[in-house]
From Swiss-Prot:
Belongs to the bacterial ribosomal protein bL36 family. This is Large ribosomal subunit protein bL36. Keywords: Ribonucleoprotein, Ribosomal protein. GO terms for biological process: translation. Pfam families: Ribosomal_L36. SUPFAM superfamilies: Ribosomal protein L36 (SSF57840). The lineage of its organism: Bacteria, Pseudomonadati, Pseudomonadota, Gammaproteobacteria, Pasteurellales. The gene is rpmJ. Signal peptide: none annotated. InterPro entries: Ribosomal_bL36, Ribosomal_bL36_sp.
Length: 37
């Protein structure tokens, strides 16, 4: 899980999800998981 100021899709499988006010990126590739912090 990477914590970043700006989250971006890294591939076409990445999805941007807003969960409880936190922007997250979910992907089939675990290396692409991100959270905005």
């Amino acid at each position: 899980m990477k914590v970043r100021a700006s989250v971006k899709k890294l591939c076409r499988n990445c999805k941007i999800v807003k969960r409880e006010g936190v922007v997250r990126v979910l992907c089939s590739d675990p290396k692409h998981k991100q959270r905005q912090g």
